[in-house]
Amino acid sequence: MLRQFIISTVGRRQPLLMILQSRLASNLDKTEYTTPGEIVDYDDPPHLPVPEYPVRPDEPLETRKQRLLYQSRKRGMLENDLLLSTFVAKYLKDFSAEQTAEYDQLINGVSNDWDIFYWATDTKPTPPQFDTEIMRLLKEHVKNHEKVQRIRQPDL
């Protein structure tokens, strides 16, 4: 029985090798379309409506800060989770009402979280409506002059 198994797997190895070689060859052809480090970013199609984020004018400051703490930790992409959660842990407690509103607009007014990441890391230019004091503070935080390891979110 073992001999039959060995023979049957040896017989199947050749087609598998051919499949792998053809896939590797097809992947090599794709390098001519993009350059290493290039950001492939497409505009959203017009048929995808982006829901408006609800404005909460009567929300108490402490409630808003708690909501922003939660939203900064649960972005849906690890890169922003780490950047924003460490930023909020360091600065949010000292934000005024105006600064808190700016931060709320920054993380909830943008339809694509990758935009926040690219702006914070200076990969793409920040649009004027989001180029605020809070964004400049976030950019400085991302530069990590203190060389702090940010491999996990801070404790609550």
From Swiss-Prot:
Q: Transit peptide, first to last residue?
A: 1-24
Q: Where in the cell is it found?
A: Mitochondrion matrix
Q: Which InterPro entries match?
A: SDH, SDH_sf, SDHAF2
Record-level GO BP terms: mitochondrial electron transport, succinate to ubiquinone; mitochondrial respiratory chain complex II assembly; protein-FAD linkage; tricarboxylic acid cycle
Q: Does the keyword S-adenosyl-L-methionine apply?
A: no
Keywords attached to this Swiss-Prot or TrEMBL record, sorted alphabetically, are: Chaperone, Mitochondrion, Transit peptide
Specify the domain of life of the species encoding this protein. Eukaryota
Give Gene Ontology CC terms: mitochondrial matrix; mitochondrion
Q: Report TM segments.
A: none
Q: Which Pfam families match?
A: Sdh5
* Protein family according to the UniProt entry: Belongs to the SDHAF2 family.
Q: Spell out the subunit comment.
A: Interacts with the flavoprotein subunit within the SDH catalytic dimer.
Task: Explain the purpose of this protein.
Answer: Plays an essential role in the assembly of succinate dehydrogenase (SDH), an enzyme complex (also referred to as respiratory complex II) that is a component of both the tricarboxylic acid (TCA) cycle and the mitochondrial electron transport chain, and which couples the oxidation of succinate to fumarate with the reduction of ubiquinone (coenzyme Q) to ubiquinol. Required for flavinylation (covalent attachment of FAD) of the flavoprotein subunit of the SDH catalytic dimer.
Query: What is the protein name for this chain?
Result: Succinate dehydrogenase assembly factor 2-B, mitochondrial
Q: Which organism is it from?
A: Drosophila yakuba (Fruit fly)
